[in-house]
Amino acid sequence: MKILSLLKVALVGSACGLSVLSAAKTEQPNILFIFADDLSYETIRAHGHLDIDTPNLDRLAAEGTTFSHAYNMGSWTGAVCMASRSMINTGQFVWRTPRTGGDFKPVVAARETWSQLLKSAGYRTYMTGKWHVSMDAAKIFDVAVDIRPGMPKDVKEGYNRPVDEAAYEAGWKPWETKYGGFWQGGTHWSEVIANHAEGFLAEAAEDDAPFFMYLAFNAAHD
């Protein structure tokens, strides 16, 4: 049985239980899913990291939902995040989740991706940022803006780590805009994505339909 089916059963069961407690609570919640790339849970203070303060992330953890038992059991590619994204969007384990564009076709045709299921439930769906899945985001989300397949175009300056302080002073810096990379028109890619998200939130505020936003940053990936 697919995980999606199990989730459906769990959600239905939860809904039945809640209806007994409060029949009035039938409103569908808005869903903002924030995807941080290669960010370990151990780097967030709310999850036990005490060396660095992360007040905004802590507030999100306190006011939202964190999945502390979610686990990626492996990958079929060197880019582990690619398998992770496939599993998240299809609800399938790593040994069953699609890998290539052709593998995704039956899943999309059956409208079994996460966003498609939510669209069927009446949600307006939105995606921006790093996708890295062999599906066309524009076909499974209502709105798909500035979709990146993976990382920015690589340049040797970005991967030649300085061997000493002198080499660092003379070399390229990650915040320099001349090679493009994480910069778009002088604005860092994280800010570009966040600006898109703010724009959609303002638009969604005028819409009665619930929304699902898939907000995928490249950060904190190096």
Give the positions of each predicted feature:
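Formylglycine-dependent sulfatase
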Residues: 2-7, 14-222
